[in-house]
């Protein structure tokens, strides 16, 4: 049994109401519920945290190492393009992770095209709405099984 940590960055608490034409109508609670069900079906455990505060995400990543977290899925949201500190935290704990985005960041504003995480990630999944998380979790299962 593996434990997978899902981290949701800033403003993702507003999913379902924030710019649904970009992010869809699915809520964060819906996403977490689906991911939990997927983990249970595979015999794994899921933990999730959403924070608008960079330091809370960093502290959670630091704690993950000591807790034996096996894999991280992270949607850094706006921190994707700005947070060297969050990148450094992921590098420091050396837990494999997948970067995940609801929208296709490469078809949006130019400032969203750069990620501080992609070169460290096992992979990047973007552009499939809430399904991006499900695809990331399926990829995490495959990595854990290999």
UniProtKB/Swiss-Prot annotation:
According to UniProt, this protein's pathway is: Metabolic intermediate biosynthesis; chorismate biosynthesis; chorismate from D-erythrose 4-phosphate and phosphoenolpyruvate: step 3/7
Which class of enzymes does this protein belong to?
A: lyase
**Pfam families in the record:** DHquinase_II
Positions marked as site (Transition state stabilizer) = 18
Its BP terms in the Gene Ontology are:
amino acid biosynthetic process; aromatic amino acid family biosynthetic process; chorismate biosynthetic process; quinate catabolic process
HAMAP family in alphabetical order? AroQ
Q: Which residues bind substrate?
A: 75, 81, 88, 102-103, 112
Residues the record marks as active site: 23, 101
List the NCBIfam families hit by this protein, alphabetically. Answer: aroQ (TIGR01088), PRK05395.1-1 (NF003804), PRK05395.1-2 (NF003805), PRK05395.1-3 (NF003806), PRK05395.1-4 (NF003807)
Fill in the subunit field for this protein: Homododecamer.
Q: What is this protein called?
A: 3-dehydroquinate dehydratase
Give the family, as the similarity comment puts it: Belongs to the type-II 3-dehydroquinase family.
Query: What EC designation does it have?
Result: 4.2.1.10
Q: What's its job? A: Catalyzes a trans-dehydration via an enolate intermediate.
Keywords, in A-Z order: Amino-acid biosynthesis, Aromatic amino acid biosynthesis, Lyase
Q: What InterPro entries does the record point to?
A: DHquinase_II, DHquinase_II_CS, DHquinase_II_sf
| Reaction catalysed by this enzyme | 3-dehydroquinate = 3-dehydroshikimate + H2O
Molecular-function GO term, any one: 3-dehydroquinate dehydratase activity
């Amino acid at each position: 049994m593996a434990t997978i940590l899902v981290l949701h960055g800033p403003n993702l608490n507003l999913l379902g109401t924030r710019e649904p034409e970009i992010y869809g109508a699915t809520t964060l609670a819906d996403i977490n519920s689906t991911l939990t069900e997927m983990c249970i079906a595979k015999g794994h455990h899921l933990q999730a945290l959403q924070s608008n505060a960079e330091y809370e995400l960093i502290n959670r990543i630091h704690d993950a190492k000591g807790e034996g977290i096996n894999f991280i899925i992270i949607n850094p949201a706006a921190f994707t393009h700005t947070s060297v500190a969050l990148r450094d935290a992921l590098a420091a704990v050396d837990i494999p992770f997948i970067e995940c985005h609801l929208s296709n960041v490469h078809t949006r504003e130019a400032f969203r095209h750069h990620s501080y995480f992609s070169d460290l990630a096992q992979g990047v999944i973007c552009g499939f709405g809430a399904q991006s998380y499900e695809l990331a979790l399926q990829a995490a299962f495959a990595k854990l099984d290999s």
